[in-house]
C-alpha cells in the first residue's frame, strides 16, 4: 500500500493515515511545537514507516520528537509504540497509568489479542509489539500536562471505552485528541444535510456505558471546537450535537445487547441488532451511502462492538 503524505488539518497538526485495514480507517497525528514535536497515537507496528516518512516530509529530525503519546493501549492505537520509540532516540512515551505497564511488557496485551484473532492473523493485522524501556515511559494521570514550546497539552482521564484511556486537549486549536472516547466518524458517511455521522465504539474488553456517558460530558465541558479522531480525521463544529448522538448510540448498543437471547447465537444476534441500528441511524441522518457499502465501511466496528457488548453482558452476569 503506497504511503500517503501527511496533511495539515489544523495549525501545526498533521494527520497520518496508518494504513490499518484500509485507507481512511485509522489515523495518528504529529504535533509540531515551537521547540519540539510529538506523535499522538502510533497505530500498529506496520504504521511506523509512515510516521518516519512524515518526519522526513516535514523536515523534522527524529531527534526533535520529544514525546509519543498513546490515548490507550489497544493495538490499533499503540501497537507500534515500541518500534517507533526505537527510531526516536530522545522521545518519552506518555501513557495512561493503567496502560503503561503493557507497553513496557506487552506480553499480556499480545496474548489477549492472539486469543481473539489467532497468531497468524494478529501478526498480519498489527505486527508484534516491541517492549519500551521503563525509563522512557511516563504515566499521565488525570490533570497531567506537558508543553511542546508555546503549545501546552492537557490530559483528562477518559474511561468508558477502556479503563486505560485518556484524552489530550490542545489549547492552541481548542481541539481534543479523543482516541476512541468520542466514537468514530468515517469520511465515507459525509455529504448528507446533517453533517458528520458518529458511531460509538464498544471494543472489548472494558466497555462501561455509564463511564462513557460521563466521559462524553467531561469532554464537552472543556468546550472544544474540534475533535481529532483516530477513526477518522478532523471534525469541527457542532460537537454538542455529535455528543448527543453518541449518548443515544451508547443506549442503543446497550439495548441491542440486552435484547439478544442468551446461548450460542448471542453474538450474531447482537451483531444483527447493531447492523439494523446502524442502517437506521444512517438513513435518519441523511447519509447518502448505499446500505451494502455502509456495512463494508463499518464491518470491523460491527464485529468488535458485538464482541465488546458480549464481554460486558458476561461481566454483568447476563
Regions picked out by a protein language model, each given a short descriptive name:
Residues 2-58, 168-178, 184:
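Conserved beta-strand hairpin/beta-sheet module of binuclear metal-dependent hydrolase folds
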Residues 38, 69, 93, 175-177, ...:
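Residue-level marker for buried hydrophobic side chains located in beta-strands
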Residues 44-46, 64-76, 102-157, 163-228, 232-233:
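Metallo-beta-lactamase
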Residues 78-88:
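Metal-dependent catalytic neighborhoods of phosphoester/phosphodiester hydrolases
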Residues 175, 210-267:
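Divalent-metal (often Zn2+) His-rich catalytic cores of metallo-beta-lactamase-fold enzymes
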Residues 255-318:
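C-terminal regulatory/interaction regions
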Amino acid at each position: 500500500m503506497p504511503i500517503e503524505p501527511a496533511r495539515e488539518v489544523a495549525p501545526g497538526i498533521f494527520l497520518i493515515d496508518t494504513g490499518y485495514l484500509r485507507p481512511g480507517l485509522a489515523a495518528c497525528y504529529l504535533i509540531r511545537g515551537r521547540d519540539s514535536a510529538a506523535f499522538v497515537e502510533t497505530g500498529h507496528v506496520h504504521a511506523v514507516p509512515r510516521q518516519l516518512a512524515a518526519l522526513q516530509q516535514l523536515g523534522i529530525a527524529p531527534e526533535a520528537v520529544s514525546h509519543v503519546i498513546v490515548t490507550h493501549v489497544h493495538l490499533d492505537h499503540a501497537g507500534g509504540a515500541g518500534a517507533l520509540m526505537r527510531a526516536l532516540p530522545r522521545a518519552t512515551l506518555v501513557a495512561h497509568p493503567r496502560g503503561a505497564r503493557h507497553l513496557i511488557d506487552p506480553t499480556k496485551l499480545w496474548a489477549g489479542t492472539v486469543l481473539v484473532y489467532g497468531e497468524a492473523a494478529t501478526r498480519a493485522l498489527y505486527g508484534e509489539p516491541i517492549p519500551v524501556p521503563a525509563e522512557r515511559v511516563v504515566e499521565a494521570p488525570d490533570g497531567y500536562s506537558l508543553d511542546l514550546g508555546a503549545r501546552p497539552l492537557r490530559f483528562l482521564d477518559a474511561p468508558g471505552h477502556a479503563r486505560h484511556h485518556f484524552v489530550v486537549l490542545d489549547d492552541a486549536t481548542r481541539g481534543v485528541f479523543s482516541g476512541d472516547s468520542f466514537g468514530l466518524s468515517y469520511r465515507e458517511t459525509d455529504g448528507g444535510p446533517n453533517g458528520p455521522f458518529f458511531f460509538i465504539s464498544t471494543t472489548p474488553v472494558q466497555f462501561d456505558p455509564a463511564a462513557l456517558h460521563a466521559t462524553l460530558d467531561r469532554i464537552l465541558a472543556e468546550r472544544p471546537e474540534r475533535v481529532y479522531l483516530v477513526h477518522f480525521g478532523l471534525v469541527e463544529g457542532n460537537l454538542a450535537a455529535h455528543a448527543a448522538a453518541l449518548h443515544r448510540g451508547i443506549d442503543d448498543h446497550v439495548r441491542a445487547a440486552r435484547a439478544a437471547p442468551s446461548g450460542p447465537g448471542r453474538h450474531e444476534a447482537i451483531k444483527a441488532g447493531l447492523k439494523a441500528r446502524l442502517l437506521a441511524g444512517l438513513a435518519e441522518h441523511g447519509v447518502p451511502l448505499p446500505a451494502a457499502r455502509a456495512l463494508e465501511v463499518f464491518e470491523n466496528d460491527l464485529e468488535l462492538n458485538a464482541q465488546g457488548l458480549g464481554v460486558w453482558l458476561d461481566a454483568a452476569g447476563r
